């Protein structure tokens, strides 16, 4: 895979006009100087990109693991309470929906909503699936796998989200 390395002084013509952070997971959390004036801030410090660094570390990335005996989804939903989350299994898919109404924060008013959909492996026992939300905002959805000779049932059913008082340890790769 070829990666183009380009000095910040030679950005494409429309680069400064394209917003960098306005439509990511941090929408509504306040803007940095770079977000409002990307050309100006890059001339002051062409290598300073806090918003890019922050978005990599705190982007709400989900992790899906399918081990030999277990299927797990870990999703950062720190801005949502269990009441704001809906987790359903519909046939071979897990649908996770989060929505909270408009509320006031440090920067004004914010409302958030997301939808995630994941395909379940065919050998996951849907009747034994659990879902929990840790105190640090990690939603963990997991279910055991059954031997391939058993046929797991497929239907729609909601999965309750329980709250855990301990933070989830960082997922290891």
Swiss-Prot record:
GO terms for molecular function: identical protein binding; metal ion binding; structural constituent of eye lens; unfolded protein binding. Keywords: Acetylation, Cytoplasm, Eye lens protein, Glycoprotein, Metal-binding, Nucleus, Zinc. Its main location: cytoplasm. Zn(2+) 3 binds at residue 154. Residues 52-162 form the sHSP domain. Residues 153-167 have a biased composition (Basic and acidic residues). The modification N-acetylmethionine is found at residue 1. GO terms for biological process: lens development in camera-type eye; negative regulation of apoptotic process; negative regulation of intracellular transport; protein homooligomerization; protein refolding; response to heat; visual perception. GO terms for cellular component: cytoplasm; extracellular exosome; nucleus. Signal peptide: none annotated. InterPro entries: A-crystallin/Hsp20_dom, Alpha-crystallin/HSP_16, Alpha-crystallin/sHSP_animal, Alpha-crystallin_N, HSP20-like_chaperone. It comes from the Eukaryota. The keyword Metal-binding applies. It is found in: Cytoplasm; Nucleus. Zn(2+) 2 binds at residue 107. The keyword Metal-binding applies. Glycans are attached at residue 162. Residues 142-173 are annotated as: Disordered. Zn(2+) 1 binds at residues 100, 102. Belongs to the small heat shock protein (HSP20) family. Contributes to the transparency and refractive index of the lens. May act as a chaperone, preventing aggregation of various proteins under a wide range of stress conditions. Heteropolymer composed of three CRYAA and one CRYAB subunits. Inter-subunit bridging via zinc ions enhances stability, which is crucial as there is no protein turn over in the lens. Can also form homodimers and homotetramers (dimers of dimers) which serve as the building blocks of homooligomers. Within homooligomers, the zinc-binding motif is created from residues of 3 different molecules. His-100 and Glu-102 from one molecule are ligands of the zinc ion, and His-107 and His-154 residues from additional molecules complete the site with tetrahedral coordination geometry. PANTHER family: ALPHA-CRYSTALLIN A CHAIN, HEAT SHOCK PROTEIN HSP-12.2-RELATED. This is Alpha-crystallin A chain. It comes from Gallus gallus (Chicken).
